[in-house]
């Protein structure tokens, strides 16, 4: 008598499950991503589609620098002056931590000026930090042929407010404190100025530089009004 094999429905279900699992594993193997080793032939340099010229989108010219700022390496022959050094303290759980704060202004007397603030436990280190910060914060200031301003300006920063006026030849720099330091290092020779705000040295320096940057030459006024220089002077 031949043996007759009988299969129950439970055995059939188990066989179907095992076959489905095997098929699923096979599909997973086929669907796995294939990684290609990087070679010099198949690697391409990264390119931005939105910016094909690789220009930084921080300024109009694409240089990445803020307007009226100068690259550190392009300025030579800088003069340095320390506006002031004061003692500051910070209260913590362990007590008061005493430090020194130094404010420095640098310029080449050709329309380039910068300022910086440095803090440290020692005065020489604070001055060194202030000078380094000033070299990284250089600004371009406009000046006419007579080494004075094109027109009157008022610079504001915080509680600081500074009035600066052009003066006739031979007048000199009529100013005091940090304002005079900034004007002299910029290269101005005949200027009137007056402090209309608080006497904080840092705010006075910032207000002076902001006021000087507000100047506009006659050519700029002519282009803004769509006129020639003759029409403006008439």
From Swiss-Prot:
Residues 78-141 form the S5 DRBM domain. InterPro entries: Ribosomal_Su5_D2-typ_SF, Ribosomal_uS5, Ribosomal_uS5_bac-type, Ribosomal_uS5_C, Ribosomal_uS5_N, Ribosomal_uS5_N_CS, Ribsml_uS5_D2-typ_fold_subgr. The keyword Ribosomal protein applies. The keyword Ribonucleoprotein applies. Keywords: Ribonucleoprotein, Ribosomal protein, RNA-binding, rRNA-binding. GO terms for cellular component: small ribosomal subunit. SUPFAM superfamilies: dsRNA-binding domain-like (SSF54768), Ribosomal protein S5 domain 2-like (SSF54211). Residues 1-10 have a biased composition (Polar residues). One of its GO terms (molecular function) is structural constituent of ribosome. PROSITE patterns: RIBOSOMAL_S5, S5_DSRBD. Residues 11-31 have a biased composition (Basic and acidic residues). It comes from the Bacteria. Transmembrane segments: none annotated. One of its GO terms (biological process) is translation. Part of the 30S ribosomal subunit. Contacts proteins S4 and S8. Belongs to the universal ribosomal protein uS5 family. With S4 and S12 plays an important role in translational accuracy. The N-terminal domain interacts with the head of the 30S subunit; the C-terminal domain interacts with the body and contacts protein S4. The interaction surface between S4 and S5 is involved in control of translational fidelity. This is Small ribosomal subunit protein uS5. It comes from Malacoplasma penetrans (strain HF-2) (Mycoplasma penetrans).
């Amino acid at each position: 008598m031949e043996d007759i094999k009988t299969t129950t429905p439970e055995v059939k279900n188990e066989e179907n499950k095992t076959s489905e699992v095997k098929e699923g594993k096979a599909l997973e193997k086929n669907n796995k991503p294939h990684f290609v080793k990087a070679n010099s032939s198949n690697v391409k340099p990264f390119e931005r589609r939105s910016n094909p010229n690789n220009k930084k989108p921080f300024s109009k010219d694409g240089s990445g620098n803020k307007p009226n700022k100068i690259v550190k390496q392009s300025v030579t022959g800088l003069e340095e002056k320390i506006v002031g050094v004061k003692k500051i303290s910070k209260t913590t759980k362990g007590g008061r931590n005493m430090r020194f704060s130094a404010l420095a202004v640098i310029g080449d007397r050709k329309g380039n000026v910068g300022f910086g603030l440095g803090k440290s436990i020692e005065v020489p280190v604070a001055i060194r930090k202030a000078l380094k910060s000033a070299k990284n914060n250089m600004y371009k200031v406009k000046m006419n042929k007579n080494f004075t301003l094109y027109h009157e300006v008022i610079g504001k920063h915080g509680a600081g407010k500074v009035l600066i006026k052009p003066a006739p030849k031979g007048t000199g720099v009529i100013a005091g404190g940090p304002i005079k330091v900034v004007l002299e290092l910029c290269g101005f020779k005949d200027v009137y100025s007056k402090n209309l705000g608080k006497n904080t040295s840092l705010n006075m320096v910032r207000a002076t530089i902001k006021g000087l940057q507000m100047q506009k030459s006659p050519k700029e006024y002519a282009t803004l009004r769509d006129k020639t220089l003759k029409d403006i002077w008439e």
